[in-house]
Each structure stands twice: as C-alpha cells, then as structure tokens.
Curated annotation (Swiss-Prot):
Transmembrane segment boundaries: 245-267
One cellular-component annotation, GO: endoplasmic reticulum membrane
Name this protein carries in UniProt: L-gulonolactone oxidase
Sequence positions bearing Pros-8alpha-FAD histidine: H54
PROSITE patterns in the record: FAD_PCMH, OX2_COVAL_FAD
Similarity annotation: Belongs to the oxygen-dependent FAD-linked oxidoreductase family.
Amino acid sequence: MDQGTMGYQFENWATTYSCEPELYFEPTTVEEIRQILELANQRNKRVKVVGCGHSPSDIACTDNYLVRLNKLNRILQVDKERKWITAEAGILLSDLNEKLDALGLALSNIGAVSDVALGGVIGTGTHNTGIQHGILATQIVAMTLMTAAGDTLECSNTVNREIFQATRLHLGSLGVVLNVTIQCVPAFRIHLQQFPKTLTEVLGDLDTHLKQSEYFRFFWFPHTDKVTVFYADRTNKPIKTTSSWFWNYAIGYYLLEFLLWISVFVPRLVPWINRLFYWLLYSAKAEQVKRSDKAFNFDCLFKQHVSDWALPIKQTRAALEQLKDWLDNNPNVRAHFPVEVRFVRADDILLSPCYRQDSCYINIIMYRPYGKEVPREGYWAMYEEIMKRNGGRPHWAKAHSLLRQDFEKIYPAFHKFCSIREELDPSGMFLNNYLEKTFF
C-alpha cells in the first residue's frame, strides 16, 4: 500500500485556498483506496478526495488525509448500443473527450474547463448552458462508490435510486467515487455565433433567444448596457476556426491583465476597461465551427474570484436589472467584465441548484491581476443579497456565505440528502470545514 506523502501542499487553481494535509495519497487500485480508508478509521482521521483543484473554494481542503485518483483513469467498459461509457473517477474530462471522439461519441454538454477529474466535476454540480440540458451530472446513468466502511456500493435509477439521486452531486461527502457510467451521444460539431446586443434588448426577448439556440448564453459588461450574445448549435458544417494570437492573447490576456493591475491603483479605469474590451473583442459579429468539446471549453484567463448562483429562470430579468441598477447607483463600486449568464434544465438531483426548476445561472468575476487582490466585498455582498431575494441557490464549487439553516430553506430535499450522508458516513470521515458549515 502507498504509505502516503508528508509535507504535500495543496493549492487550488486560483491560488485562493490551500492546505497541507497530514498525508497525501495517489492510489493505483481500488484495494489501495480501501486500505487508506481502513488506516483512516484506525487513526480516526478524515479523508478528502481532490480532483484538479479548479473549485474556487475550500471544498477540497483538509489537514488530515488528501487522496488524488489521477492514477485511476481508465475507461472500463464501452456499450456501443446504448452509447454508455464506464470510466474510472480519476480520468480527466480532457482525456475522456479524446477517447470518446475516437469512438465516434461525445458528451452532450460539458463545462468551460476540461482539465478536471470526472468524479469531482459531477460532485459539485458543474454546468454549462442550454435550457434543454441539465447540469453535467444529469448525463450519469450509474455510479460505484466506496463508503467509509470500505464497502462498494452501486447505484443507478434502478438500483439504490435514492442514493443515486444524492451521489450525482455528492460534495465529496458520501464516499470515494470509483467509477461512473455516462450516457453519450454521437460525436457532433458546434456552429458558434457571436453578436452584439444591449442588456435591455436581450432581457426583453429572452424567450426568443432560448428557443433560437440550443446552447444560448450571454456576457453582460458591467457599467454599460452592452451584451455579447453567444449562440451554439449542432451542425454538419466543416471545422472552421479563427484563432489570432494577437487578439486572443496579446490583447485578450496580457493587455487586459496589465490594465486591470493599473486599475487596482486607479479604480475609475474599470468602467473604461470594460467598454474598451467590449469594443476590441466582443462588439463585432463572429462565427466558428468546432468539435463539440472544443466549442464548450474556453480560456478562463488568469487568477480570479468568482461567484455563480442559479435562480428560477423567471427571475432572470429582475435579478440582472437589480444588479445593474445597484452598480449604476453606487459608482464607487467597480465590477469586472463579464457577468456570464447561462440557462439549465430542471432535474431531480437532491442538492442540484436546478432541483425541480429550470434555472438561470448568473456568474460574476473579479480578476486578481498578477495575483493582486481587488476590492470586491461590497459587490459580492450585494450580488448575494440580490440572488437570495430572487430565490437563488449558489454553485457548490464556488465560495459563498450560506450555512445549513440557509440550505434547509432553499433545498426541499436537503434533509433527505443529510439522512443519506449520515447513513453512508456515520462517523463523518469525509467531512471538512466546508462540509461542516454545510451540514451542521
């Protein structure tokens, strides 16, 4: 058995959270995972499984045992007739996408980042956009996990169904996910279209946009009424990409980071920067054709703070208008672009932000140019207040201020999930500070 490594330091991608676990493990077999859990039981230690550290919160942090499943990354089974793929939980989506493409398959929807582990990305409710599509976990048809007692447990819509409703968004609190079976679709290409609008126009015609494009989303540029609309739809057209190092990186990365760094010292520049980059990169019509996963992924640029809440889709207009009005009436508060707005179908996953409601996700961002912190407290607090006012639920992977008493009010199935968690992990082996605030 891997005896674990001492002195390992974990830091998330955004470098906003870190920890130094007592022992760090990279098991290579299911039996080694069982031995790690046995050791933790013997020594009364807690265990956290971490993926690639993309979550902008402390959800993966622990000072006990940290386990990474990156060496458990195989495809175990391919059911060509049903288009089901069973893969180990440590496989990266980027690797899975390539293997699926070689099989003539694809996932029907994925998030913005593919350098993430399969078992982790479903555990926090990762989503993309498309009102016909649920969060990523809705594509899961079966899972196998190991409980704190070292038992393996299979679940699906027909086997241990209630546990399946919980494990598809598990928060790392139910056990160690061993493998996942995913419903795939035939490989497809995406026609991407980008065009300018105003926020007033988009909100006034929201239903039309939702019907017009399968994967519709938009960027709003705070301190302006400017919006860039993105349509993404399946196509048989040949691949056609337009990539420019100058515009994408010299301007869209390096110049932007430099100007945002200057704005730390001259905050009044932020509205000007938002307008400038809208004009430089987002004000013109553009179109491309890409392989589906390449179309869904995009560059998250440099280090950042983000917050992302889902609210009932009928509250989209009210929430964005309230946020815009507040920023307009508080000129000393600065907000970076973009505010990204996406749409997701309802589901029956117990802790899904989309539980039993079609949802709009509103994601705000404040960059940390060259690692420099930017004032954001007032913006963050008012954003959360507006989201709460409009029936919002926070993205589990992203930092928020809610506690158990809040979740009890906004999640009808919260107590049901808690009962399942207590049944599978009665001693709290898989808890950490993040989860204690959630469940206690």
